[in-house]
Amino acid sequence: MLDHPLNSLGFAKPPAATRVVVAMSGGVDSSVVAAELAAEGYDVVGVTLQLYDHGAALAKKGACCAGRDIHDARRVAETMGFPHYVLDYENTFREAVIDEFADAYLAGATPVPCIRCNERVKFKDLLQTAKDLDADCMATGHYIQRKMGPAGPELHCAADPARDQSYFLFSTTPEQLAFLRFPLGHLASKAETRALAARHGLPVADKPDSQDICFVPNGNYAEVIQKLRPGAADPGEIVDLSGRVLGEHRGVIHYTIGQRRGLGIGGLGDPLYVVRLDPERRQVIVGPKEALSTRIVPVREINWLGDAPLTSRSEWQVMAKVRSTRASREAVIRPLSDTEAEVELIAPEDGVSPGQACVFYAPGDSRILGGGWIWRGAR
C-alpha cells in the first residue's frame, strides 16, 4: 500500500481519518480554525472550557470563555456540523491561575495570567482531554507558527507582527508542541481571519476581539483581588529612595513598576515613578525615571526550546522581550541551571517588573527559544 501524502496538519492520512480537537473560546479566531478544518474534511471536535463564574461575565463584551462565548462556540459548531462539548474547569482555573494572580499582586509582582492559563490549563488539561478523545492533534486560534526544524517542531512568531502571541506561549513544551497545531499563524492580518469567518457564514464574523483579563470584569483587577484576599488593599507609606515618607498609598496591589500617574504626591519637582514595591513593609518606593533603568534581569522557571541544552553554553546571544507590548532587544543569557539564568540587556530598559515574562528569540530569525519569569533583584 502506497503511503498517503501528508495532509495540511502533517499526518500521512486523509483528513477524514484525522481527528482534531479545536480549543474554542467562542471568538472569531478559534471559530475560523474549526470551520476551516471542518471544511477541509477533518474529523473536528470542538471543546470549550468554562473557566470561571459567569454571573458577572455573562454579558461582558471583550472577555473570552464567558457564558455568551460558550453559546457562540456552540452556534459555530452547529453551523459547520461538528460535535461540541463544554467542560467545567472552574475549580482548576481558580487553583492554577486566579489564586496565583492574586498572590502575585500581594507579593508586589505584576503577573501575566494568560501565560499561566495556556501553560496549566489549555496546554495541559485540555490537551490531555484531546488525547483522551483519541485526537491526532489539538488546534487553537493563537497567532503563532509551528515549523518543522532539523530537531523537530519549532515555535515561530506569527506572520503578522501586530497579532503575534509568542510572548504568551513561551512556556509551551516540546512535548506539547508535537501535539499542537496553529492554523492561523501564517495569515498576514486579522482582516484575513474575518474574511474567512464571513466566507463560512459564521455568526461570530464581526465579533469584537477579546480584551483585558477574562476573569476581571471591567478591568478592575484590584476589586477581584480584594474579594479573593480580604485585607489586600491595606494602606501604607509612599517613600523615596532614601526612605523619606512622601505620602500614603491605597494598597500595594494598586501599583506597578514604572507607574507615574495616580500616586497622589504631586508638587515635589521632577516626576516620580514607582521603582520598587515592598509588600512586607507595605511600602511603595518611588524615584526619578533614571532609577527605573534595568540591565540585569534574574529569570527562573525557564522553558528552553533551543536544540542544544541551555547549560551547554556559558552564554547565549539572543533577542529578549520583557513586556508583551515592547519590541525584543539584544540580550545575553548566562545560565545558572537548567531553569534559572541571569539575563543581561545590552541596552537598559525601564519598568522591568517581577511577575512579567522574559521571552527569548533567535537573533535574525522568527524562532522562539523559550523564556522564563522575571524574579526580584533586577538591577
Curated annotation (Swiss-Prot):
Choose one Gene Ontology CC annotation of this protein and give it: cytoplasm
Q: Which cysteines are joined by disulfide bonds?
A: 117-214
Q: Which SUPFAM superfamilies match?
A: Adenine nucleotide alpha hydrolases-like
One Pfam family hit = tRNA_Me_trans_M
GO terms (molecular function) for this protein are: ATP binding; tRNA binding; tRNA-uridine 2-sulfurtransferase activity
UniProt keyword annotations, A-Z: ATP-binding, Cytoplasm, Disulfide bond, Nucleotide-binding, RNA-binding, Transferase, tRNA processing, tRNA-binding
Reaction(s) this enzyme catalyzes, per UniProt: S-sulfanyl-L-cysteinyl-[protein] + uridine(34) in tRNA + AH2 + ATP = 2-thiouridine(34) in tRNA + L-cysteinyl-[protein] + A + AMP + diphosphate + H(+)
Sites marked Interaction with tRNA? 142, 356
Task: Name a single GO biological process.
Answer: tRNA wobble position uridine thiolation
Location of the active site: 117 (nucleophile), 214 (cysteine persulfide intermediate)
Name its cellular compartments: Cytoplasm
Query: Taxonomically, which superkingdom?
Result: Bacteria
Residue sites binding ATP per the record: 23-30, 49, 141
| Enzyme Commission designation | 2.8.1.13
Region of interest (Interaction with tRNA), residue spans: 163-165
* Keyword Iron-sulfur carried by entry: no
* Membership in a protein family: Belongs to the MnmA/TRMU family.
Q: What is this protein called?
A: tRNA-specific 2-thiouridylase MnmA
Q: Supply the source organism's classification.
A: Bacteria, Pseudomonadati, Pseudomonadota, Alphaproteobacteria, Rhodobacterales
